[in-house]
Amino acid sequence: MDMDLRTEGRWDQVKGRVKEAWGTLTDDDLDRTEGKRDRVVGVIKERTGETADAIEQKLDQLLDALKK
């Protein structure tokens, strides 16, 4: 599913958490994704070589932590 991570109104927080979790990412990398989850996963996969499933799992954990 192509979820827009900006709809939560927390895109800046999400970007910060993603950059902490995957230190090789830049603001430009994340801005290129336009907040689209599938694009975020793609950029992380491209930069790190992690599997999409592993990235999705970690991203879910980060998003869940932001909701608390």
What is the predicted function of each stretch?
Residues 1-68:
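Intrinsically disordered, low-complexity, hydrophilic segments
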